[in-house]
């Protein structure tokens, strides 16, 4: 479950939306999505190389710690963002009725939730949803490099720890007799949790804001790190009897 409740699939699925909200524009957000996939592939190969050299436990602990820190870094970056439209910006917006946004020009917002709420109220949900990337690019003042770095580190840490290593670990924890059904049940729960996270993620961004959403995921990762630190055995080179003895003790 820790795999999914850190928000990994939600971040992948809504990567373009997240990057729009950083204010880097629609085209750049698509390019950043490609970058995420590339980072994931590279660090998965790193995990394959290291898993039998370092062991499962160190990779999972290092990766989970990195996930927690990177998510909290994203949260901090979003919390420092401000949102402000100037009158001169309105002429650069490509959609009709952009002049309606004069009502909020020169007003500085310290919450993305309040800014988006006012823009939606003025333009309507339909116009906003079609032009949100353009509006946010104009209005957002944020350390985009900091947030982008946080997201890339998050993807990298997941790709060499919770992503591939957890499945190797699970295959070594269960006896052959129960391995198939156990991993099947875990896969089902994993997919179910992933679907639920992806369903609530857009609501979180809209209702709670970017900073609080990433903070929640970061705290979950911190808790996950300490749980793994406490109970996770090293399975490398150990028999089921040895693992059972370790877990019982």
Model-derived regions, located:
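Alpha-helical transmembrane bundle of multi-pass membrane proteins
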Residues: 1-249
């Amino acid at each position: 479950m820790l795999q999914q409740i850190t928000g990994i699939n939600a971040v992948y699925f809504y990567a373009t939306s997240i990057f729009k909200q950083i204010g880097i524009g629609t085209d750049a957000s698509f390019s950043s999505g490609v970058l995420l996939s590339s980072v994931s592939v590279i660090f998965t190969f790193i995990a394959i190389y290291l898993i039998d050299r370092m062991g499962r436990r160190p990779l999972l602990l290092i990766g989970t710690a990195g996930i927690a820190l990177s998510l909290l870094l994203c949260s901090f970056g979003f919390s420092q963002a401000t949102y402000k439209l100037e009158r001169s910006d309105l002429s650069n917006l490509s959609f009709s009725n952009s002049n309606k946004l004069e009502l909020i020009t020169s007003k500085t917002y310290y919450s993305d939730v309040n800014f988006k709420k006012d823009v939606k109220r003025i333009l309507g949900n339909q116009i906003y949803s079609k032009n949100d990337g353009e509006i946010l690019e104009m209005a957002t003042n944020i350390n985009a490099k900091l947030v982008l770095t946080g997201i890339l580190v998050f993807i990298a840490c997941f790709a060499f720890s919770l992503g591939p290593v957890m499945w190797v670990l699970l295959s070594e924890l269960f006896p052959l007799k129960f391995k198939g059904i156990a991993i099947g049940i875990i896969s089902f729960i994993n997919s179910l949790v992933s679907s639920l996270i992806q369903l609530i993620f857009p609501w979180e961004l809209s209702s709670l804001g970017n900073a609080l959403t990433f903070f929640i995921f970061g705290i979950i990762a911190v808790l996950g790190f300490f749980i793994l630190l406490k109970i996770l055995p090293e399975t490398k080179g150990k028999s089921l009897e040895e693992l059972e003895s370790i877990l019982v003790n």
